[in-house]
From Swiss-Prot:
This is D-aminoacyl-tRNA deacylase. Its EC number is 3.1.1.96. HAMAP family: Deacylase_Dtd. Its main location: cytoplasm. A Gly-cisPro motif from one monomer fits into the active site of the other monomer to allow specific chiral rejection of L-amino acids. Disulfide bonds: none annotated. It comes from Pseudomonas syringae pv. tomato (strain ATCC BAA-871 / DC3000). SUPFAM superfamilies: DTD-like (SSF69500). The keyword DNA-binding does not apply. GO terms for cellular component: cytoplasm. The lineage of its organism: Bacteria, Pseudomonadati, Pseudomonadota, Gammaproteobacteria, Pseudomonadales.
Amino acid sequence: MKGLLQRVRSARVEVGTEVVGAIDQGILVLVGIEPQDTRASADKLLHKLLNYRVFSDADGKMNLSLREVSGGLLLVSQFTLAADTKSGLRAGFSKAAAPALGAELFDYLLSQARIAHPVVAAGQFGADMQVHLINDGPVTFLFET
């Protein structure tokens, strides 16, 4: 499972003209699910997302986690993170999970996030989404579990 974390001042995701998820300060995470991923992969990723120190303390050092700043978590599924781009000029998606597994694991990740953290929003799995964000830093990390 891959999670591309971006620290944001705010972010929102729309499907058509409807806003389906939005946060103020926090992290936007694009989630890519692969065939070998399990609930354990999702649990490991969630632990990293909630506890990784990406926010600045009073001295300007990245010493604070999402939990410590009470920031928002916006999860957006993105199967293209599992793309194979090693050869040719067109991505291959054989390394992406099948839609049924992807939906199951994304829903699990989202449900566990809502249990563990007070401010959680999400995009719509499988939808054509427009993601708007104000990147803060920019600070971006790629996690692979």
